[in-house]
Amino acid sequence: SQVTGRASEDVVLFVGTGATSAVAKLVSALGLAGPLPPGWKPNDRPVIFVGPFEHHSNLLPWRESCGEVVTIGENSSGGLDLAELEEQLRRFASRKLKIGSFCAASNVTGGLEDVDRVTATLHRAGALALWDYATAAPYVHV
């Protein structure tokens, strides 16, 4: 919380080898690397919500995990479609582990995401909010 100015339950992962390594480390730490563990049913799978402009560093580790990846589209302003995110959070409400993993700024469009609003939406649904600041960090207060 001293670094981010956020709540004490927030975490920042500093990994010197880039965003790909950070996401892969997180996937492993959450026990989600590889196929669905024995005895798990398909509905036991965690669900990972990603945005329309994610860099492969945020996509590939999740696609290689046992989680189900759901892509949220863009709204008319070019940002993440919060209405669609809310709809998908309701659709997957029964999943024990829900994760939103998004870039704070798109390296495709340069657009900044409303991190606080998206995070609040995820938290209201009991989901984790994960943010890749690789593109945004030089331009925003972290």
Model-assigned labels for residue ranges:
Residues 1-142:
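Pyridoxal 5′-phosphate
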